[in-house]
Amino acid sequence: MIETTDSLRDCLAPAKLNLFLHITGRRPDGYHTLQTVFQLLDWGDTLHFTRRDDGLITRRTEIADVPPEHDLTVRAATLLKTHTGSPEGVDIEIDKRLPMGAGLGGGSSNAATTLLALNRLWKLNLPRLELQALALKLGADVPFFVFGKNAFAQGVGEALDVVQLPPRHFLVVTPRVHVPTAAIFSEKALTRDSKPLTITDFPAELSCNTEWPESFGRNDMQQVVVGKYAEVAQVLRWFENVAPARMSGSGASVFAAFRSKAEAEAVQAKLPAEWNSAVAASLDQHPLFTFAS
């Protein structure tokens, strides 16, 4: 990251993985309650912010099918400006790397990076908990990225506890299909009654078991997505004799964990050419974690 008085450049908006995802119920308002462990990665979109004196908030990058007014970075900046009454404006540029509709939290992470970066650039000095409350207005995953640590999440994803996870390298494979999260959550076949866990149920498994992630929990959305999207099923089948693999979030991305970058890259080299893939290392905290207290 490069910081000047009027700009913040090369701000990573890290991807996340759901190491498991259990859906434990559905609230009267239609939102689902869940339990998951979020893992940060050192791979994601890169954002650039330049302060404006005229108070305008603009996105300088064209993104197909995402008009600026619907972009979570613009919405996050607008929400923060309205909440604080700040006279400042900003130009936002996005180097897009994460595929959309992939279960990697790309839009949510961009929103959180915007909140954290502007908290610094606009000299707002809002505490982290206040930013997390704003983040929840933008989406269920956004508070996690503002929280900024690998976490056990509950509720709709806003109740967060830090978890210590081992260093890993992940191979993330994304077939060329977009999976709409809302549509999967509305599927009648979706399991909504997983038995709730406590935080003490899983850390030793996640840290020590060499067969992880297959050895602990599951992704309750995976079976539904596999039944609707043959491309996701194909990726999971490919991994069956290679390494334990699991879908992240509502898909379409599938991931496998490895002890070293070399192991992950050796498997990546064997993938079919038509699949997007990346090898990424685990992160312990968000790169902009210190921009809130």
UniProtKB/Swiss-Prot annotation:
ATP binds at P99, M100, G101, A102, G103, L104, G105, G106, G107, S108, S109. One of its GO terms (biological process) is isopentenyl diphosphate biosynthetic process, methylerythritol 4-phosphate pathway. It catalyses: 4-CDP-2-C-methyl-D-erythritol + ATP = 4-CDP-2-C-methyl-D-erythritol 2-phosphate + ADP + H(+). The active site is at K16, D141. Pathway: Isoprenoid biosynthesis; isopentenyl diphosphate biosynthesis via DXP pathway; isopentenyl diphosphate from 1-deoxy-D-xylulose 5-phosphate: step 3/6. SUPFAM superfamilies: GHMP Kinase, C-terminal domain, Ribosomal protein S5 domain 2-like. Pfam families: GHMP_kinases_C, GHMP_kinases_N. One of its GO terms (molecular function) is ATP binding. Keywords: ATP-binding, Isoprene biosynthesis, Kinase, Nucleotide-binding, Transferase. Belongs to the GHMP kinase family. IspE subfamily. NCBIfam families: ispE. Catalyzes the phosphorylation of the position 2 hydroxy group of 4-diphosphocytidyl-2C-methyl-D-erythritol. This is 4-diphosphocytidyl-2-C-methyl-D-erythritol kinase. The lineage of its organism: Bacteria, Pseudomonadati, Pseudomonadota, Betaproteobacteria, Burkholderiales.
